[in-house]
Amino acid sequence: LFCRLRSSRRAAALTALDKVDTPEARAALRAALVQNVAKTKAPAVLRLVFHDSGTRSVADRDGGFNASVRFELSRPESFGLKRGLGPVTAVFEATRDGPASGLSFADVIAAASAYAVELTGGPEITSKLRFGRVDAQGPDPENRMPAESAASTKSAFRAMGYTTRETICLPGAHTIGGKRFGEPYVFDNAYYRTLLARPWDSAKNSSATTDDLEMGSHVGLTSDKNFATDDESLEFINLYAVDQNLWFRQFTEMYVKMTESEATWRDT
């Protein structure tokens, strides 16, 4: 009897999941994304997915991608996230009625951030996403976001289950937004090309003027600049700087992995 009850519950859960991920649900979600996510908000929307997944701990088997970012907005590292949360909330509200009403907030963050990549010229990722996540009901543990040095950043990403290649693949997303890696609304491999050029480094750019170096000093985060002088990181920076398609493919794989990390699913 117990086994039959468990089987019945699992079948019901799977049926509920099937209703979440249908062609009709995906079409309704797509319409809401197009309506509510503007290109000018794409960098802020994409930033959400990194902050939401950046709390993952493989050792503790907690944190990760679960929409807990909604409850973490007062943290110092979350400054400015409300700008991205607005469009995502609008997409979520627009899908509360109709075939996409079963999507969780985490599902919508994953889809909206993927759409932000596509909207700015990057790879199409949304169709590769799995839906049916369960939302967190409170914040994840604090003090898990990466620090500034290359070594500490790689260590933080290892704690989240990522290799060095994967660690270097992800921050290429800084190519959009205000970090000054190329055009702010163009998703390309300018991040890696800029790291190799090191416009902030007078030794690398001996003919640069003081004004040039001053402008260069405002490019990227300290952690980005530290990658540019880390031998292990440079192996992958060089690869992505010359092969944008390779980076697009591997970023897509990493995005899917990141949005499934430590997620709780409705069919489990």
Task: State where each predicted segment sits.
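N-terminal mitochondrial targeting presequence
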Residues: L1-A13
